[in-house]
Amino acid sequence: MVPAERPQAAFLYELMLEYPLREAKGLRPALCIATCRALGGTLEAALRPAAALELYHNAFLIHDDIEDESQLRRGRPTLHHLHGVPVAINVGDAMLALSLQPLLDNIGFIGLGPSLRILQAVARMARESAEGQALELEWIRRGQWALEDEDYVHMVEQKTCWYSFITPVTLGAIAARQDARRTEQLAEFARCLGIAFQIQDDVLNLSGEVGAYGKEIGGDLWEGKRTLMLLHMMRHASARERAEAERILSLPRPGALPLPRGPELEPLLEQLVSRGELTPEGRERLRHALAESQPRAEEKTPEQVGFLLELIHRHGSLDYARRVAREWLRRAEQSFTACEGWLLPSEHRHLLQALLSYVLQRVK
């Protein structure tokens, strides 16, 4: 899918492979293919939708890492930390553009009607994902903490469930030429599974080990994300604890302030990188060193993040989140049971069923 005949853009296409070639779960294409095959569809029918989903996912990760100022992705530095924000944004944009081609190629394999339905589903997925991300960013921007669990679930449905669970299952069902009723039943299974998955991901962010998790431990606290644990802790904290927690969460993380981008400095840095006299990593270190020499507002400290984590443990918020995740998993099991009768007995159905136990047992 990556063009080999465009040498002038070789650097772009090389970076487009950066995230996909890192060790990952491959969850979205696996869901799409397993659903299609469990419904009697062919591997050929599911391959292109699955490839488009994986391209979209990696593009979303690049942009999400920039928006969240994340430092690690799949156990290695994020793309914007390695190559700078402008390059990373462009790589993400290119991956989104490239994801359209396999969807158009579908027409020659599954016909015009199913291909258009898949395009409609992907368009819905993109809109829901962007709205969910916007909702979370707005909560952080406004310092909004007057939120209930239902608000969190709604955000997760949009930001995570649509592109990670609902749409992969939906595309697999469409590729297998299933009717709307069965497709909707599978989508409900995927929705409940996705909510449980995201809650567990949030739990791992605070309790996992970086070697297994592959992302920054405690990153959600550094970024001030509204997770189920933080919302629960805020509801049960004393007024004094809550006020201090809100103050800490409103602070930027170290290095989050805009780095210097002087009109003379940037072209020089780019020239040094292009001539091989400075590595992309060295460029970023130089930018940060220059930024450190500038006066800064107060930033979060490790001690403050540790205080937030201690409050979460003190008020039983991790255990609460685990209980809620188990309830959503129970709903997913009920939804899967309703579908089980018309899923073909196969390794593909087994994979879908195995996800029910995997979601809460996973460590990354």
Where are each of the predicted segments found?
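All-alpha prenyltransferase/terpene-synthase fold signal
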Residues: 1-364
